[in-house]
Amino acid sequence: MELLLSGCEAIEGEPSNVLCHNLHTGTLVSTFRQSSPAKNATCTTLNHLLSAQHTRPQLNIHNFGKEILDQSIILPEILICVQSSPCGSWLAAGTEKGNLYIWSLKSGALIYFFRAHYQPLTILKFSNDGMVLFTASNDGDVFAWLISTLVDQNSTFETSNSSVKAISHFSGHKRSIVSMEIGPGPIVSGRLYTASEDNTIRIWDVSTGNLLTTIALPSTPSCMTVDPSERVVYVGNEKGIIWIPLYTGSSTFSNNVKEKKRVTSVDNTTIPNAIGGMGRVVDYNDSRESSIISCQSPITTLTVSFDASLLISGDKDGNVLVWDSVSRQVLRRLVQYYSPVSFLQCKVDKISFYSNSSLSFPVLKRMITNEYLNSDVRICIQDDGVEQLMQPENILKISSDIVTQGSESSWRAKAETSEMQLKEAKRLFYELKQIHQALWEKYLQK
């Protein structure tokens, strides 16, 4: 069963609820009261719903087995964005001062906090493998932080905050970043999507930090989401929803009006061409597959279902609509809130709606202490060599080795050596074959 969690902004101090619907039938499954979800400040773990309050330093916790508020935790300062790791071990939070907090969800200990940006943080995203944390802010920059470095006990207690350095820096946007998405799969082969108030969407290669494509939009985006196969980017703005295909086979994106890419086909099968690339700037309407669906109210948030067959939108009037991603028609309206929709999330994992006292959420500490070093909670941080793989100098070194070793004379020498080795292998094979034939004939004569 695929569930949809949705919520709206709190108005005039009145708390709002988060509703849980069956995405495919529209049936109301559960209600989580007084959660007051804020945009980019609400997330879920395996057993809990977390929502940070924008008006006070407080984090509301809901157990999926209870409809009422489970607990409220007082925080060091007001959080404007939160995100939990896919493994359920870490909670990252950003503040208006640009501070980044890292808590352990196993013990509640404050592991680390430091000044990550000079301006307020807007969005936090973990990679799908949980190895890297991406932070975006009003300054238009995105930093990638290695989790194993942020939560390492040695770096926490034996070094200063200034020693923590991002493994990648994505810069180029001129204004605040309003939405950010990470492509599926391992982080070393993933892509990063950022939407900014400068009316552009930028697609980055995570491992190298290079800009792949810039998509120019007709107006300022308010939200963005990408389907799990990275085929289409959905953008919401004040006029409606924009479908932007990342691959096209009929009328492709071009760098200018006169130049058009040819459609490649093999056996009457069209091979899709990726838009942009090599840092090119393309316009959203350069493809026939792209389109704008007008809506009566400005779009505030978007998400897609597990198989990308459904697109779910929330607007300023409080409508939560389910769209068919192929026909681009509205299938149903799940709910209408009294304020703008601020939170949408699809969950495929089975959620237990039965109360369980053993699933209590730990109290988040407000200060860094060494108490958790002596606790019984131990987390093994696996070193997959992500930091080394994502270093640009390594890639440049590999490229230089290919260039230096790829001269014509060296390739000719390698080809001659391979040919001689092949001839020698054939000669030995024929000798061995003759010996085997002689032994076989001798055996038959007995």
UniProtKB/Swiss-Prot annotation:
UniProt xrefs under SMART domains: WD40 (SM00320)
Key words, A-Z: Chromosome, Nucleus, Repeat, Ribosome biogenesis, rRNA processing, Transcription, Transcription regulation, WD repeat
Any matching Pfam family: WD40
GO cellular component: cell division site; cytosol; heterochromatin; nuclear pre-replicative complex; nucleus; rixosome complex
GO biological process: DNA-templated DNA replication; rRNA processing
Record InterPro entries: G-protein_beta_WD-40_rep, WD40/YVTN_repeat-like_dom_sf, WD40_repeat_CS, WD40_repeat_dom_sf, WD40_rpt, WDR18/Ipi3/RID3
Subcellular location: Nucleus; Chromosome
WD repeat spans: 74-113, 116-155, 172-214, 216-257, 294-333
Primary residence: nucleus
Subunit structure: Component of the RIX1 complex, composed of ipi1, rix1/ipi2 and crb3/ipi3 in a 1:2:2 stoichiometry. The complex interacts (via rix1) with mdn1 (via its hexameric AAA ATPase ring) and the pre-60S ribosome particles. Interacts with rix1, gcr3 and Las1.
Protein's job: Required for both pre-rRNA processing and heterochromatic gene silencing. Component of the RIX1 complex required for processing of ITS2 sequences from 35S pre-rRNA.
The protein's name: Pre-rRNA-processing protein crb3/ipi3
Organism per entry: Schizosaccharomyces pombe (strain 972 / ATCC 24843)
Gene that this polypeptide is encoded by: crb3
